[in-house]
Amino acid sequence: MRLIAIAAVMAALCLAGCGSGTSDPGDGGVLRATFSSFPDYLDPALSHSEEGWTAIYDTYVPLLTYRHADGKAGSEVIPGLARALPEISGDGLTYRFRLRDGLRYSNGKPVVASDFKRAVERVFVLNSSGSPFFTDIVGAAEFAKTKKGGIRGIVAGDRSGEITIKLTHPRGTFLQELALPFTAPLPAGTPDEDLSGNPPPATGPYEIVSSKPGRGWSYARNPYWAKANAKAMPQLPGGSVDRIEVTVVRNASSQVDDVEAGRYDWMENPPPPDRYAEVKDSYEGTQFRTEATESTYFFWMNTTQPPFDDLRVRRAVNYAVDPEALERIYAGQVVSTQQILPPGMPGYERFQLYPHNLGKAKKLVEDADPADRQITVWTDDERSQEEAGSYLAEVLKDVGFEAKLQVVNSDNYFSLVGNQSTSNLDIGWASWFQDYPHPNDFFQPMFSEESIFPTNTSNLARFADPKVSAKIAELAEQPLTPAVEAEYADLDREVMEQAPWVPYGTGTLGTFVSPAIDLDQVIYNPTFNQDLTSFRFK
């Protein structure tokens, strides 16, 4: 959701696309930003992280999208490349769209209906962690296995601009999922490979014109935004700044210093715990703002191999971990909880199956008497996560294991722990931020059997329970009524009784900008975080 500047963008590119329809004094200029790590991907089919979605929200527009707004308003699904929300058949199985006229990619090619069909197929070809959202399309499950013949449940007419999607059964969350970046159309001929180093042409107000994985990337105005797409999609903002240059700066304290001094205009990640209070006290309301999130921080356990294939061991770790100790590590930026669903999510119901009890944890490990006591603890190299991983390693030692900490560059962390071929995937840190405001998003990607892949898996615990998977699928078909919310609360408890995770908190993030930026104008979208189109200079 990084070497002072990345390669300069040619002025001609900027001038060709300038203009969001305004001439306010704050328009124009170059926004200089820092991220603590390079996103998982800068490819819309693959990106599935808060950093990645912040980076691509204003470049790749799906058929539907989320309103560019703060809070609850930002969770509203609105038309993107489609003229309107779809016509949905009475049985909930058929969705009909029509593309807007005159749409162009940033390379000048016209956007056509078949580009959407290919985008969905590309998600499956690349084994994207987003593919479970679309397996209910007729023919998608078969295509996921064979990667041949196309998905027959999508019919696209390039002349008419009409797109028809047929589902195998109703899916109550399908509109929200279509508004995610995964299936944003891309031009015909886009390679079926990770394009993070050379991101594909854009349909949004900005295009990524340079990318150096691990170091940074830069944007210019899409030259076809003002010419075509802004007229076709007047509901979407065009952005104020002309260019954006992002640099990866791994030392969060240095980022704070740089933003204070005006060397950078914005740091995407929050201030580090040891600087958080200082920044909050000094700049809240003028340069700093705390942002609530729907998120869960947790430790996953690999349920497919010893010792965590034993329920007693998994429960022992839950008893041994003290969420309040982790809250202190994060200096209050994570508030302790022990549920899968975060407090603001429909279906949340507070419970505490595993109150901190080290003695009980030791007894469970003693009863299980696992033969394998050599544990690898995985985490990334961002400071709070590394400290959380160190804490977990010490807890495991306290209950009778030999634990080794494996710290991974945050750029590659989820690619490594999501890859089945990675050795010693025992237990590790992770966090999950909502994809869309529905409790299904906290269950299907992480606890359904269909979300286990050889690569890019989001089910990090490799948790496979047919009964739970069936319940997740059943609830996904239904409208989100109070009765269904109560069923999600029951599902939360049911999964945690099997203890594939150790949930320990829900997080807040922060927006920290230089004195040159108008903080009041910065939009914090609940799915995509800071909206690049909303940054403007005073």
What are these regions (language model features)?
Residues A220, K227, F308-V399, R462, ...:
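Append "and occasionally in soluble cytosolic enzymes with long acidic Gly/Pro-rich linkers
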Residues A33, G108, K397-S451, A486-E487:
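Periplasmic binding protein-like
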Residues T34-G90, P201:
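N-terminal lobe/hinge region of extracytoplasmic solute-binding protein
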Residues G19, P86, I154-A156, R315, ...:
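Extracytoplasmic/peripheral linker and loop segments enriched in polar/acidic and small residues
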Residues T511-K538:
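Long beta-strand-rich cores associated with HINT superfamily self-processing modules
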Residues H68-K72, K148, P170-R243, G359:
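Gly/Pro-rich hinge or "lid" segments in bacterial periplasmic/extracellular proteins
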Residues R96-R98, D115-K117, V125, S129-P187, ...:
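Surface-exposed binding/hinge segments that line
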Residues D192-G197, W225-E278, E402:
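Ligand-site clamp/hinge motif
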